Amino acid sequence: MPNEVYDVTIIGGGPIGLFSAFYSGLRSMKTKIIDAEPAVGGKVRYFFPEKIIRDIGGIPAITGENLVANLKEQAETFHPTIVCNERVVDVTRLTDGTFQLITHNGSIHFSKTIVIATGSGTFEVNKLEALHVEDFPLAIHYDVKNIEQFRDKVVAVSGGGNSAIDWAQTLEPIAKQVHLIYRGEDFKAHEESVRELKNSRVKIHIHHEIHELFGTNNQLAEISVICNQTQATKTIETEALFINHGVKVDLGTMAEWGFEQADFGIVVDDEMKTTVPGIFACGDSATYPRKLRIIAAGLHEGPIAINSAKKYLEPTAADEAMISTHHESFIG
């Protein structure tokens, strides 16, 4: 029903939003997820479907695709309403305290509370800027769904963050050769990942940037890279390019919703409350002192936000849900 009112609407269907939906089910809250993308999973679904994630407790290693599938299955335990391809552009509090959410296509949703789990917002990858990029559209990759297509090929990765290093390490045992091109010197990645990279077969080109692409019939054969210290150039053989130059993020109209924001997200307290009563934030959407930006931390923040939403609606409710092993939904 279009005018149905939900106890909580979670804006964002990435890993944190999905787990928050599961936890809200434990709290018997009528739940809706609204996501701007065609499918749930957030940046993990888009950027990391075949990459291995290793920083979630109890899961030594899992692909992004499998993590999203597991979280979606878990989220659906209590049958939340999931709406995709809708970006929330306006939130208004009605006279009865209910929030009215309007999406970009004019759809209207109603909710008693809101949990923002949009990560850094909607995103657009930063594209490679180099000569003749337009001649090799099939050789330039910003996300990869099947790494087997690069088996026994020479490939190059451009970037210096965790994502670039993860891709270089993922491709290293599959590709004939992997080149990592980075315009800086000090990688912006986990120390252990950098150590493993330097001990691998990956050829590292620091202080270099991609300048020009070469090939025939739209088949990439070589790239020219330039040293930003000496301006010297060199040619690297490669059949495919992986570009990890970050993303442009857009919080859209959230800046107009009335809550306090800082450089790295929406300001929350230790209960994930924003400065607007009834609106909560978690995951990369939220910021507070000593914030840890990993999935495992967000999976902790989501339930805190849901518990706060529950207490907002029912001040006498229990502070937290019964643990799942004792929950009536999983007994008998």
From Swiss-Prot:
It catalyses: 2 reduced [2Fe-2S]-[ferredoxin] + NADP(+) + H(+) = 2 oxidized [2Fe-2S]-[ferredoxin] + NADPH. GO terms for molecular function: ferredoxin-NADP+ reductase activity; flavin adenine dinucleotide binding; NADP binding. Its EC number is 1.18.1.2. It comes from the Bacteria. Gene3D superfamilies: FAD/NAD(P)-binding domain. Disulfide bonds: none annotated. Keywords: FAD, Flavoprotein, NADP, Oxidoreductase. FAD binds at residues 35, 43, 48, 88, 123, 284, 325. Signal peptide: none annotated. Its cofactor is FAD. Homodimer. Belongs to the ferredoxin--NADP reductase type 2 family. This is Ferredoxin--NADP reductase 1. It comes from Listeria welshimeri serovar 6b (strain ATCC 35897 / DSM 20650 / CCUG 15529 / CIP 8149 / NCTC 11857 / SLCC 5334 / V8).
